[in-house]
C-alpha cells in the first residue's frame, strides 16, 4: 500500500501539477485547502479540481474565524508592522495552515507533507520550520522547489497529465490573499523603478477614483481587539470583511514596499490591507490614551521582536509565547472607541474615548481656569530631574572645558 502525503493545495497550477508529480513518486495524495478569506476564489471548485487531477481525498477547512481570532488578533494587539509598513498578511496565515496540514496528516496516517513554496521565498522556511516543530519525524516534500521547471516545461507536464492550465496563467503576478489583505509580486513589479499598474490592485480603488465625501466609522475595542463598528457588534472575521470593503472604496491600505526577506534578498511587494490600515491605526490611537507612560514607551520594543518572529517563521517558539503574554497584559486596559475618518487613501483617527481606562485628564491638560495641574511643583521637579547631570558636570567640567578649548 502506497504511503500517504498531505499537500497544501491552493488550486493554482504549481500545486496542481504537484499532485501527479507526487503520485509518480509513489504517494497517495491528500489535498488540503484552508479558507482564510481568499477574495473571490471558489473554494468548492478547488476541492473538485484536486480530486479530478488525482488526489484520493480533498479537504476544505474553514479557518476564517480561527484565523481572525487567534492569529490576526496578535498582530492587532502588538501593532505588528514588518519594517514599519507590512502587517504580515501572508506570514500570518502560514502557522494556521501548517497546523491544519499536520493535524490532517496525523488523522489520515500520512507520512509526509508537501508544500508549493519555491526555493527563493520565505514560505519554505515558514512551512518547514513549523512542521519540524510540530512533528520532527514528518517527511517534507517541496515539488516546486525541487523540480525547478521553466514555465513552458510546467505547462507541458500539465498537459501530459491532464492538469487544467488556468485561463489567467499568463498573468505575470504571484498573488496571495486572506482576510487580512492581499500581496502581489513578480512580473513588472520586479523592477522597483516601475510604477505598479492598475491591474496590480484588486481590493482598493485608485485615490483619484475614490468618493469626494469621507466616511466616518466608530470602532469599539475590548481588551485591545475590535468588537463593533458603529455600535454594531460583529465577529472579528466579519468586521474585517466589512472594513476591507468600505476602506477599499476609499483607496486605503495600499503599500508599495521593498522588504528584506528572511532568506537574504530584497523583494518588491505590493500589498493591499484596507481593514488592517483602519484597525491598526485606531488601535494605536486608543493605546495612546489608555497605556501608562512607561508601558507605552517600552511596548514598541516588544512589538518589533514579535513582528520579526512572525515574519521569520518563529511563531512556534517559547520567546514568542512569552512576549505575547506581556502584550496580553498591556491590552487589559485598551478599552474604548475611536472615530476613524476614511478619505482619499488615508485612515485618520479624529476622536477617541475610553469610559473606564482613559489616562487623559482634561483638567490636568487644559490651559483654562479649570486647570488643576500644580505648576509650582514643576520647580522642584526640575532640580531633581537634572540633578545627576548637574553633579556630573560639576565634577568633570566636560562642557566648560570644551568652551575653553574653543
From Swiss-Prot:
Belongs to the argininosuccinate synthase family. Type 1 subfamily. L-aspartate binds at residues 118, 122-123. It is found in: Cytoplasm. It catalyses: L-citrulline + L-aspartate + ATP = 2-(N(omega)-L-arginino)succinate + AMP + diphosphate + H(+). L-citrulline binds at residues 86, 122, 126, 174, 183, 259, 271. ATP binds at residues 8-16, 116. Its main location: cytoplasm. It comes from the Bacteria. Keywords: Amino-acid biosynthesis, Arginine biosynthesis, ATP-binding, Cytoplasm, Ligase, Nucleotide-binding. Its EC number is 6.3.4.5. GO terms for biological process: argininosuccinate metabolic process; L-arginine biosynthetic process; urea cycle. Pathway: Amino-acid biosynthesis; L-arginine biosynthesis; L-arginine from L-ornithine and carbamoyl phosphate: step 2/3. This is Argininosuccinate synthase.
